[in-house]
Amino acid sequence: MAEPVRLGRKRPLPVCPNPLFVRWLTEWRDEAASRGRHTRFVFQKALRSLQRYPLPLRSGKEAKILQHFGDRLCRMLDEKLKQHLASGGDHAPSSPSGKKGASKGPPEQVQDSSMPVPTQPQAGSTSVGYWPAQNSGAREILLQLYREHLNSDGHSFLTKEELLQKCAQKTPRVVPGSSKPWPALRSLLHRNLILGTHRPARYALTPEGLELAQKLAEAEGLSTRHAGFRPEEHHGEDSAVPEALSEPGTTEGAVQQRPLELRPSEYRVLLCVDIGETRGAGHRPEMLRELQRLRVPHTVRKLHVGDFVWVAQETRPRDPERPGELVLDHIVERKRLDDLCSSIIDGRFREQKFRLKRCGLGHRVYLVEEHGSVHNLSLPESTLLQAVTNTQVIDGFFVKRTMDIKESAGYLALLTKGLERLYQGHTLRSRPWGAPGAAESEAKPSTNPLCSLLTFSDFNAEAVKNKAQSVREVFARQLMQVRGLSGEKAAAVVDRYSTPASLLAAYDACATAKEQEMLLSTIKCGRLQRNLGPALSRTLYQLYCSHSPLS
């Protein structure tokens, strides 16, 4: 007699890949809820994001690829994990006790979270036996993500734009346009070697991809020393260095590029015109015609900040298609009066000045060009005059007013000739982004030009407006939308409270509503270190603590 068919579950329920992190986030959420703090919402969002993530995490740093995980929360997880292991914990956050395939080594031997962790490939994985070809797009993607993983100052992920930019430096033939599909990226996603999260997508290595990338790096002789990075060293809480809002870190491209040195006879001064200045209806724009008439050597490019910059271009380069270029320490932003009026109304005026201050160049020129009658504009003449005056007196820009486009072109021609004379006979050298340079030239006026300059690629890459931003940077931009809150004031607030969550926690710790209103009033701002003041402090309190619609 045949045995009866036994119906049952064919697949076991999936085991939680990160039980410790889930448990700790749940505890923190419940504790915040019991105290009535707003941080419970932060922990709840992070918990949901973690529960949807199917792969194991070996440190809090790795959790940064997930949504709602900021620097502070990742540090909290790492500190909690360190305490757990120090108290005799017998497994990592991604290896629940009793789970098959748990690490067999002694519990005391815990690898550094910033170093590659080799894992066994899963059964049935499509990545088993896969080895990307030399100079292929897939190989370069894995290596670039591996470098980012080793970078202690990085995020352990890259966006598609960042991947395209970095891979184009090594294998330009296999890199498509930014709007086109990338077969190599799709193949790695299909093989479960990389993981895509967020929108726009962020790509990071999976454990299988990390193991393969480590083998590729060893095959190419790439190590943490050759990559220009060092593994993260854990020295307790003192190792956490707060980020500065106005001091962007050194880019990977700046680390990898060989130093560029241009001797006096090896370069020429060239004016770079933003492509936005060249748009015309069926004819070449007047600005380019005037520059050609004045015989100003120039080129048209996409500039992410400013309208005109000058570069020292190599005259006898090794690669004629890619000559070395160093950006001289001057930048010009051109505004017609009608454009100035509209930019003040829609908020671009303050944002553009803030980005110009952070572009890495010390001498900033604001070129204001007359256009038609002032009485036909949306703002009164006194408002425009006040804005221009503030730009010179408060922001420290050099303001130049011209009558028309011909006079503007003539001024650019004079600047070009002046820079040629200024740098004549000087040897120019490249410097990485963030190294001392422009700040020194501003602090100590001198007749000698700044000869330690940014490369054009570094300058333009760091000036990208819509690049991936940290919570700190987005918080600062949000603060700057408040009327009366300048970039310097926003930076001062963010230096004290780096995220909205930390600000809300500070509000929760206040005993009375009056104390909450005055919480930010004594924050020191700007070079004169003046207080933020009660009015702005009250406005920010109403913005972040009001449960009803703002009036």
UniProtKB/Swiss-Prot annotation:
EC number in record: 3.1.22.-
Binding of Mg(2+) 1, residues: 274, 277, 307, 333
Domain of life: Eukaryota
Keyword Cytoplasm: no
Signal peptide positions (record): none
UniProt key word Metal-binding: yes
Active-site residues from the entry: 274, 277, 307
UniProt keywords, alphabetically: DNA damage, DNA recombination, DNA repair, Endonuclease, Hydrolase, Magnesium, Metal-binding, Nuclease, Nucleus, Phosphoprotein
Location of the region described as Winged helix domain (WHD) in the Swiss-Prot/TrEMBL record: 131-230
Family annotation (InterPro entries): DNA_pol_lamdba_lyase_dom_sf, EME1/EME2_C, ERCC4_domain, Mus81, Restrct_endonuc-II-like, WH-like_DNA-bd_sf, WH_MUS81, XPF_nuclease_Mus81
Ranges annotated as biased composition (Low complexity): 92-107
UniProt tissue specificity: Expressed highly in testis. Expressed also in bone marrow, brain, thymus and to a lesser extent in heart and skeletal muscle, colon, kidney and spleen.
Cofactor(s) of this protein: Mg(2+)
CDD domains linked to this entry: WH_MUS81, XPF_nuclease_Mus81
Family stated for the protein in its record: Belongs to the XPF family.
Subunit structure: Part of the heterodimeric DNA structure-specific endonuclease complex MUS81-EME1. Part of the heterodimeric DNA structure-specific endonuclease complex MUS81-EME2. Interacts with BLM; may stimulate the endonuclease activity of MUS81. Interacts with SLX4/BTBD12; this interaction is direct and links the MUS81-EME1 complex to SLX4, which may coordinate the action of the structure-specific endonuclease during DNA repair. Interacts with DCLRE1B/Apollo. Interacts with RECQL5; this interaction stimulates mitotic DNA synthesis. Interacts with CHEK2.
UniProt name for this protein: Structure-specific endonuclease subunit MUS81
UniProt source species: Mus musculus
